[in-house]
C-alpha cells in the first residue's frame, strides 16, 4: 500500500549510557542516520539536559528524525519519519541500534497518509518530494 510517508517509532533499551549523554556524538550519529536513509539534511537542533539526557531533531527534506535519551536508564526514544520512495528509514534504525549498542529494541512502522485514505490515485507521484529533489539537482 502506497503512502505519503513511513514513520518508524523505535525504543532502544540497554544502550551505551555514555553515548546517550554525549550531545556531540548523538548529533553526529543522528545526522549520519539521515544520510544512511538517503535523505537530504535541512537543519538540526540538539539540547543537553542537566544532569543528563539529550533531545534533538534532524530536519530532512523528506521529513524528520528525532531522539530523546534517558542515559540513566540506557534508553532512547527515536522517531524516523520519511517521505518518498527514495529514502529507507529502516537503514537509520539499523544504524542507530548498532551505534547505541542497544541490546534490545521495540519498533513499529506506521504508514502516514495512505493513498487510499487520502484519496490519492495509487499511481500518482509524490509531488512534494519530486519538487524538493528538482531543487537539489
Curated annotation (Swiss-Prot):
Q: How is the cofactor bound?
A: Binds 1 pyruvoyl group covalently per subunit.
Active site (UniProt): 63, 68, 83
Q: Name one GO molecular function term.
A: adenosylmethionine decarboxylase activity
Keyword check for Lyase, yes or no.
Answer: yes
| UniProt KW keywords | Autocatalytic cleavage, Decarboxylase, Lyase, Polyamine biosynthesis, Pyruvate, S-adenosyl-L-methionine, Schiff base, Spermidine biosynthesis, Zymogen
Q: Which cofactor does it need?
A: pyruvate
Q: According to its UniProt record, in which pathway does this protein act?
A: Amine and polyamine biosynthesis; S-adenosylmethioninamine biosynthesis; S-adenosylmethioninamine from S-adenosyl-L-methionine: step 1/1
One GO cellular component from the entry?
A: cytosol
Organism superkingdom = Bacteria
GO biological process terms, alphabetically, are: spermidine biosynthetic process
| Sites bearing Pyruvic acid (Ser), chain numbering | 63
Q: What is this enzyme's EC?
A: 4.1.1.50
UniProt catalytic activity? S-adenosyl-L-methionine + H(+) = S-adenosyl 3-(methylsulfanyl)propylamine + CO2
Could you say which enzyme class this protein belongs to? lyase
Q: What processing steps or modifications follow its translation? A: Is synthesized initially as an inactive proenzyme. Formation of the active enzyme involves a self-maturation process in which the active site pyruvoyl group is generated from an internal serine residue via an autocatalytic post-translational modification. Two non-identical subunits are generated from the proenzyme in this reaction, and the pyruvate is formed at the N-terminus of the alpha chain, which is derived from the carboxyl end of the proenzyme.
Q: Where is this site: Cleavage (non-hydrolytic)?
A: 62-63
Instruction: Spell out the subunit comment.
Output: Heterotetramer of two alpha and two beta chains arranged as a dimer of alpha/beta heterodimers.
Function text: Catalyzes the decarboxylation of S-adenosylmethionine to S-adenosylmethioninamine (dcAdoMet), the propylamine donor required for the synthesis of the polyamines spermine and spermidine from the diamine putrescine.
Return the similarity comment. Belongs to the prokaryotic AdoMetDC family. Type 1 subfamily.
Name by which UniProt lists this protein: S-adenosylmethionine decarboxylase proenzyme
Gene that specifies this protein:
speH
